[in-house]
Amino acid sequence: MARPNPNKQVVELNRTSLYFGLLLIFVLAVLFSSYIFN
């Protein structure tokens, strides 16, 4: 509770990794759907 800065950095890192994972899943879904429809 005395040092909230490392916790804030960890939360931001988890948030960016979550967004990167969602973006990767979205790209894979688009490529997979285009592969199916073509």
UniProtKB/Swiss-Prot annotation:
Organism superkingdom: Eukaryota
Keywords: Chloroplast, Membrane, Photosynthesis, Photosystem II, Plastid, Reaction center, Thylakoid, Transmembrane, Transmembrane helix
Principal location class: plastid
InterPro entries listed in its UniProt record: PSII_PsbL, PSII_PsbL_sf
Pfam family, one: PsbL
GO BP terms: photosynthesis
Membrane topology: Single-pass membrane protein
Subcellular location field: Plastid, Chloroplast thylakoid membrane
Cellular component GO terms held in the UniProt record: chloroplast thylakoid membrane; photosystem II reaction center
Membrane-crossing segments per the record: 17-37
Family indicated by similarity: Belongs to the PsbL family.
Function as written in the Swiss-Prot or TrEMBL entry: One of the components of the core complex of photosystem II (PSII). PSII is a light-driven water:plastoquinone oxidoreductase that uses light energy to abstract electrons from H(2)O, generating O(2) and a proton gradient subsequently used for ATP formation. It consists of a core antenna complex that captures photons, and an electron transfer chain that converts photonic excitation into a charge separation. This subunit is found at the monomer-monomer interface and is required for correct PSII assembly and/or dimerization.
Subunit structure: PSII is composed of 1 copy each of membrane proteins PsbA, PsbB, PsbC, PsbD, PsbE, PsbF, PsbH, PsbI, PsbJ, PsbK, PsbL, PsbM, PsbT, PsbX, PsbY, PsbZ, Psb30/Ycf12, at least 3 peripheral proteins of the oxygen-evolving complex and a large number of cofactors. It forms dimeric complexes.
HAMAP family: PSII_PsbL
Record protein name field: Photosystem II reaction center protein L
Name of encoding gene: psbL
